[in-house]
């Protein structure tokens, strides 16, 4: 099992627009110091799951059929804006496991395109996704959202 952090920034990201602090100045000078919107990739056996889809370049990063699906914690823009581009793909279906949130981000549920929101997580529900065990834990974050707890062979982590 391998976890790759693709984006660790909050809604502001780093560098923060207009900020002149040392960290933001350094991030402007060195791309490696930038913090992109939330997203991670978990690879387990022959499966690849995206945890949150905050990156806007998902269609360039992940060729068609390269993801097993998406584990979405909630639908704030900084965690889900990549879905807005991804949904317009063709020739495949990508399962999105996350909380039921038809009011979530813009009109994603109304116009899902290739995204399949048909299996939302319930609080404390555990699912087996191949060798990966995933549990949705409720969390209040301006509205009720989910924290994803993932386990592989006895090891666990919260995202």
Give, region by region, the residue ranges found by the protein language model.
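Binuclear metal-dependent hydrolase catalytic cores
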Residues: 1-158
């Amino acid at each position: 099992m391998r976890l790759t952090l693709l984006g660790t920034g909050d809604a502001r990201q780093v560098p923060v627009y207009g900020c002149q602090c040392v960290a933001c100045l350094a991030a402007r000078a060195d791309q490696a110091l930038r913090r992109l919107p939330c997203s991670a990739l978990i690879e387990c056996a022959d499966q690849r799951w995206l945890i949150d889809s905050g990156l806007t370049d998902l269609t360039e990063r992940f060729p068609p059929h390269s993801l097993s699906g998406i584990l979405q914690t909630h639908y704030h823009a900084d965690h889900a804006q990549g879905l807005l581009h991804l949904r317009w793909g063709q020739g495949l279906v990508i399962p999105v496991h996350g909380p039921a949130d038809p009011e979530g981000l813009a009109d994603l549920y109304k116009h899902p395109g290739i995204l399949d929101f048909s299996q939302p997580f319930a609080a404390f529900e555990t699912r087996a996704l191949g060798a990966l065990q995933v549990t949705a834990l409720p969390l209040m974050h301006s509205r009720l959202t989910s924290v994803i707890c993932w386990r592989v062979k006895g090891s666990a982590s919260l995202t």
